[in-house]
Design a protein with these regions (language model features):
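Conserved beta-strand termini and adjacent loop/short-helix elements that scaffold enzyme active sites
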Residues: 315, 385, 474-476, 512, ...
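Short gly/pro/ser/thr-enriched loop/turn and capping motifs at secondary-structure boundaries
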Residues: 342-345, 436-438, 559-561, 666-668
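Rossmann-like dinucleotide/flavin-binding elements
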Residues: 402-431, 472-480, 484, 491-501, ...
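Rossmann-like dinucleotide-binding cores of NAD(P)H-dependent redox enzymes
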Residues: 427-467, 543-591
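Flavin-dependent oxidoreductase catalytic cores
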Residues: 1-408, 412, 416-423, 427-428, ...
């Protein structure tokens, strides 16, 4: 079978190794002991199976997640060379079985970006020179010594040699990228050394230069060495990232220096530049949420490609084979890099080759199953693919006994339950009381930055058509209709929480679901007030602010964006967006009344002397602080205060083999709904 993506599926040489196609799996951290041996730093069989599954699916190059080579106990191949080589052969042989190649990524670790834990003390993870920690600015990471630098370089070379012995095809140096240690050395904003590793750009890159020279000396010139590389930093200041559309003064690496560094990395002997953008101070660039444009790094990476003669990879919300084919054909890049999309669908390579794009299960850039779980110290996985990282134990098998399964509700949880049961051979009926599938997710997917949510919804609808599932629309299930089924999934969703507030019977008050479902509520006037500073409320605020409205968020607690499972990358970008659009946030406050185009807001303020002058009215001082009333102009109010489970039918029929899932059990997020359905359905 031929493919229309002839450039994407053409071979390419990296150093002395030829890749079968131009699709590369990008490195993502795999730290849990179930996937990465805490002693040797070799991948366990579960960890290896995770990568092998992507090779099986048609990925040409696998680049593994970071493995430390720093002089510390455990997770260091150099300390256990024979054991490491033996364990790694299962991975390399498994990847080669499908014709793919594999590079193992080694890291000099995080420097100032270290999470300080009981296991990893701050003194173990030095920065180039004393500097404030990313996560706790009250802590200063110490400066690394020259003796330590020498040891790091030796360990990189020795670890690379072990990979070669284990049958690996190359290594990747982590990283002049994302504000990790080598990147901190490379950028003057972070590197304040005064010796030969600081000052000039040549000095700041000396560490990266000596690493590749040592690897080549140990493994031979033909042994491929890639480097993970962030072209631009997009840093406004410590812990302040720049948005794609804003003008700012770059504190990190700008594009001109990024091109210069790329040329120097090539001259040092690196065989491939694995490119993205960003830093820990602009974390939403290396880990782009749905608010980022698609292929957000391509415009910068293509400038690097013009300047070098080694293969260049581009990653970052880059999941469109049409765009990749065009970019490769036009010489803008050499290789399409994907991370999260391959977690969501490990068969991407084959589906791209065959042109089956509608069968691709999309990444929705939520970070809940991948980055979020990594930073909780848990296994890497995926919100829309529960089997990710558990390829063998979560693999679907044919059911020993075929059963009649009833699924009540056609939201994501209900459709996932129906899909899995049908794949396992059960007889499935799905009932949906409305005229559409998707439940509240239909409204959530409405904003233009949620295109992948809409793709996921379309994918589920296609599964319902392609699989032997009887779908009954516009039908509300009663207790009598549940008779005769062996297994029942109750996925009846949730009801929006309503507020009883004077004036809220106005047509100028809408709830989040209605506001999103209708696409865009037409508002006469410029002032919009959002009640509720959760994820949905803040995204609605963004939508209206982008239209030029003056937006105020009223939140009853002390924090906004306190959403279950929200990753730091998504949080940071949305907070920067709200700040950029000057969205006003009033915390510890409630709306008491809406009248005459104004909302009466009662705010509890502890620092009351600074607020008294801007208050219209004041209450008596209470034990928690002073209560201040504001009159906030509001031409329209959107209420976004969450949902309440709709478990009424479940309460009528609950018993053995009746499962309450999704928002009907607990309104949370996409991952919870899909995972709960999968984990039950895979075993019945």
């Amino acid at each position: 079978m031929s493919t229309k993506y002839t450039h994407l599926f053409s071979p390419i040489k990296v150093g002395g190794t030829e890749l079968p196609n131009r699709i590369a799996m990008m490195p993502m951290g795999v730290f849990s002991p179930r996937l990465l041996d805490p002693k040797t730093g070799a991948y366990t069989k579960d960890g290896a199976d995770y990568y092998i599954e992507r090779a099986k699916g048609g990925t040409g190059l696998i680049v593994t997640g970071v493995v430390p080579i720093i002089p510390m106990p455990g997770k260091n191949p150099v300390n256990f060379p024979d054991e490491y080589v033996e364990k790694m052969r299962y991975l390399t042989e498994g990847v080669h079985k499908y014709g793919s190649k594999i590079f193992i990524q080694f890291t000099a670790m995080t420097g100032r970006a270290a999470h300080i834990t009981n296991e990893i003390e701050w003194k173990m993870l030095p920065a180039p020179a004393p500097i404030q920690n990313v996560w706790d600015p009250t802590i200063q990471n110490r400066g690394i010594t020259k003796e330590e630098i020498k040891k790091y370089i030796e360990n990189f070379a020795q670890a690379a040699y072990l990979v070669k012995q284990a049958g690996g095809d190359g290594v990747e140096v982590h990283a002049v990228h994302e504000g990790y240690l080598l990147d901190q050395f490379a950028i003057s904003f972070y590197n304040k050394r005064t010796d030969e590793y600081g000052g000039s750009l040549e000095n700041r890159l000396r560490f990266a230069k000596e690493i590749v020279e040592a690897i080549k000396a140990k493994c031979g010139k033909e042994f491929p060495v890639s480097v993970r590389y962030s072209v631009r930093s997009y840093v406004k200041d410590f812990n302040r990232g720049a948005l794609p559309w804003e003008e700012f003064e770059e504190k990190g690496r700008d594009l001109a220096e990024g091109i210069q560094v790329a040329k120097m990395l090539e001259s040092f002997g690196y065989d491939m530049l694995d490119c993205d953008n960003g830093s820990y101070d602009s974390w939403f660039w290396p880990h782009p949420p749905m608010y980022m444009p698609k292929a957000c790094n391509l415009k910068d990476v293509q400038e690097v490609k013009k300047a070098v003669n080694i293969p260049v990879v581009c990653a970052g919300r880059f999941d469109d084979p049409e765009l990749a084919e065009q970019a490769i054909e036009e010489g803008k890049i050499d290789i399409m890099g994907m991370g999260r999309p391959l977690l969501a669908d490990p068969e991407l390579g084959h589906k791209f080759y065959e042109g089956r794009l509608e069968d691709v299960r999309p990444c929705i850039s939520c970070h809940q199953g991948c980055l979020g779980r990594i930073f909780q110290g848990r296994d890497i996985s995926c919100a829309v693919n529960p089997a990710c990282g558990r390829e063998k134990s979560y693999a679907l098998t044919e059911a020993e006994k075929k059963k009649k399964v009833l699924v009540i509700g056609g939201g994501l949880g209900g459709m996932e339950a129906a899909r899995v049961c049908a794949l396992r051979g059960h007889e499935v009926d799905l009932y949906e009381k409305t005229d559409h599938l998707g439940g509240v997710f239909v409204a959530a997917a409405t904003p233009d930055f949620k295109e992948d949510d809409r793709h996921l919804l379309a994918w589920y609808k296609k599964q319902m058509k392609d699989l032997p599932i009887q779908v009954h629309m516009n039908t509300e299930v009663t207790e009598d209709m549940t008779k005769g089924y062996d297994e029942i999934f109750v996925a009846t969703g949730a009801k929006e929480r309503k507020l009883e507030i004077p004036g809220f019977d106005s047509p100028h008050v809408t709830y989040a679901f209605e506001t999103l479902r209708d696409g865009s509520i037409q508002i006469d006037g410029e002032n919009v007030l959002i009640i509720g500073g959760g994820l949905t409320g803040c995204e609605i605020a963004y939508m209206f602010a982008r239209e030029g409205k003056k937006v105020t968020i009223v939140e009853m607690t002390e924090t906004i964006l306190n959403a279950f499972g929200l990753s730091a990358a998504n949080y940071n970008m949305l907070m920067e967006i709200l700040d950029y659009y000057k969205v006003k946030v009033i915390k510890n406050a409630v709306v008491e009344e809406f009248r005459d185009g104004k909302a009466i807001v009662a705010e509890t303020v502890k620092n009351y002397p600074n607020v008294a002058n801007r208050a219209k009215l004041m209450f008596a001082l209470g034990p928690q602080g002073m209560k201040v009333k504001h009159e906030i102009p509001a031409d329209h109010i959107v209420v976004s205060v969450g949902y309440l489970p709709d478990d009424r039918l479940y309460e009528q029929i609950k018993g053995d083999h009746v499962y309450l899932i999704g928002d009907a059990k607990r309104p949370t997020n996409v991952m919870d709904a899909i995972w709960a359905a999968y984990e039950i359905a895979k075993d019945i």
